[in-house]
Amino acid sequence: TIPIVDEFDTSGAYTHGDGIRLTYASFIPETKQNKTPLIIWLHGGGEGGTDPTIPLIANKAYNYASPEIQKYFEGAAVLVPQTPTRWMHGVSSNYTRGQEDDIYHKALMGLIQNFVKNNPSIDHDRIYLGGCSNGGYMTLKLLIENPDYFAAGYISSLAYHNEFVTESQLLRLKNIPIWFVHAQDDAVTEADKTATPLFKRLKQLGNNNVYYSLFDHVIDISNQYGGKNYLYNGHWSWVYLHANQVFYD
C-alpha cells in the first residue's frame, strides 16, 4: 500500500442523465483557506474500469496530494475520475482522435460540476484540468466545450489530433492557459500530429499563456526503476509531469 493513496476517498461514483456511470477518487485537504483550488487528473487508455485506485497509482496521480505539490496552493482538492472503458470511445467507433464525438465528455462534465457543487469550499475560479494520452484528449475536449469553466489546462502526450481541431474550436481556446508536455520520440501519439502543430496554431492566434515542454526522450530521472539514463517508452511524458520536473525558463 502507498500511504498517500489512503488519504483519497476512492468510493466516488456519478451517474449522468444519459445513464453513463463514472467512478472517481478525491482528496480534500486540511487548509486554512476559505476557498481551495481543484486539480483534476484524467487517466490514460490503460487505466479504465471501476476501481479508482488504478488511475491514482498507475501514473502516480496521487502526487497531486503530496506536500510538495500542495504547498504551491496552500492546499488543493484533487479529483481523479475514471471511465469504464476509455475517454476516446467514439459515438460510432471504438476510438476517436477528434474526428467525431466521444460518448463520455458530457457525463464527465456532469461529474465535475456535481463534485464542485457538493464541495462548496472549492474556488470556482481555480479549477485546473489535466490528463495524459486518452486523458489529454478529454482535457482538450472539455476545454473546447467549456472554455469559461476551467482556469487552465495541462496536457501530457496529447491524443487529440490537430487536424480535427477546427478554427472555431481553436478560438475557444485562445484565452485559456495551457501547458503541453510531450516527447519527440512518442510513437503512440506523435508530437508532429498533435501537440506541436496545435501549440503553434495557438501561439499564432495570440494565446500568450500557452506553453510547450518537448523532450527528446523520457528518461528515468529517479534512477529507481531503470537506472541512470534509462529510456522509458517515449509516450510516457507524464513521468516528468508527476515528478514536478517540467519548468518554464
Task: Give the residues covered by each predicted segment.
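Primarily recognizes the serine-hydrolase "nucleophile elbow" in alpha/beta-hydrolase
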Residues: 116-119, 124-172
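A domain-start/cap signature at the N-terminus of enzymes
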Residues: 1-38, 76, 198-200, 210
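Active-site machinery of serine-nucleophile hydrolases
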Residues: 38, 45-106
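Gly/Ser-rich "nucleophile elbow"/oxyanion-hole loop immediately N-terminal to the catalytic nucleophile
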Residues: 30-31, 90-133
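Alpha/beta-hydrolase fold active-site loops
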Residues: 37, 76, 126, 151, ...
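C-terminal catalytic histidine-bearing segment of alpha/beta-hydrolase fold enzymes
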Residues: 181, 185-188, 193-199, 203-249
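The conserved beta1-alpha1 loop
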Residues: 42-44, 157, 182-183
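Short beta-strand/loop motif that positions the catalytic acidic residue
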Residues: 173, 179-182
